[in-house]
Amino acid sequence: APTGAYICGREDLVELCSYVWTAPGLGAEMGSYAASYRPFFEGLFLAPHITRQAMMSAEFCAAVFKVLGFDVVPEPGHLRTDLITAITLGSEENMCSFAEAVQNWSPVDSDAVPVPGPMPGYTDPIIMAAGTFVQGSTIEMSADGPVRPPYIMYFQGGLVFEHTMLAVMGAAEKILAARGGLED
């Protein structure tokens, strides 16, 4: 475990182990986590703010794409129970444009080009965009969805609201450009 361990046995051997696991002379007096609890407490401190940033990002995404005429769930102003916004984009081209914009605006692997591909457990190709610091992170900005009618993209996360705003606007711009602009 990254935050400690249990040692049992003869008392003198347990004490010897404690010096090997921490530092000579410190032994069990050092505590269970030599690397410190700072990252743990930092996470507890930042979690409410980052969660709020992601919730604001989801709400912004829903509002932008609702104004552009796309079906979104949940709709802006409605109760949210998670960070995900489902956007019915209506075409594979729109899904790919959305994913490309999210990837382009990502802090990691922004030069990668998302393309639909097979994934175990799915019968349809999946497109994913996630230039995240932590692979598989759900609080960081990402988008994915099965490439099949009605072409729903699932957008989630965002560590920094202003950054996610740029990505959402980039996705809207890409989709609008492909269809020739904003419709009345």
Placement of each model-derived feature along the sequence:
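Active-site C-terminal subdomain of aminotransferase-like
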Residues: 1-94, 174-184
